[in-house]
Amino acid sequence: MTVGRRKLGPMTVQSESDLSIVLGVDLDGVCADFYSRMREIAAEWFETNIDRLTPQVSYGLSEWGIKNQDQYESLHRFAVTQRDLFRTLRMIPGARKYLRKLSDEGFRIRIITHRLFIQFFHAAAVQQTIEWLDKNGIPYWDLCFMKDKDQIGADIYIEDSPENIVRLRSRGYLAICFGNSTNTTIGQPRATNWSGIYRIIHSKKDHMLDVRTPLAKRRS
């Protein structure tokens, strides 16, 4: 599901035939600090002191006592519908700065998120997501809500989900891991901050353009 397109700042209008490198950028855990905000909400949900909930979690939040998918979805539903989770997330430092730099340099920013996995609350999730992007000044060309991110057609993915990274890499895509406690087993390329992500993208830029140029010539 692609919601829309927009430009912020001096982003230039690009056609589908341009050689602009498309960055597939995840939101939660990459641009938005999902786990710190969810930790606050979980402390309220469980009626416990936040210090009892470790900030070092794995995917699924079992460290907080979440035992199955139903419990995870119940907490997530409460967070989205009663605490405006996606509207109140703090931005990960550097996300706006470096995405703007990349946008100004001609990279196409494609935000890709799987926030619609809980039924019946899609409208709230979409609205909160758009408002958060606007509030934090995150530049993007496309906003896509999808589970299977390899179908988006990005050249470089920035992702924190270990499952998504393994899937993307197994299919031949360049997936940069945004490191956190959920993905400690994922190897390079990875970085734990946006300055590191920016450097990796630029280290791969020439190779990506070399790969795409012959294809563009065949199309012309």
Residue ranges and their predicted role:
Residues 100-104, 134, 169:
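Anion (oxyanion) recognition and catalysis
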Residues 143-169:
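Conserved Lys-Pro-Asp/Glu-containing loop-to-beta segment of HAD-superfamily phosphomonoesterases
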Residues 2-71:
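Active-site neighborhood of HAD-like aspartate-dependent phosphohydrolases
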Residues 86-91, 95-126:
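Substrate-recognition element of Asp-dependent hydrolases with the DxDx(T/V) motif
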Residues 54-57, 110-120, 126-151:
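A short, structured active-site edge motif that brings together acidic residues
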Residues 50, 60-97:
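Metal-dependent phosphoesterase signature
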Residues 8, 139, 162-220:
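Asp-based, Mg2+/Mn2+-dependent phosphohydrolase catalytic module
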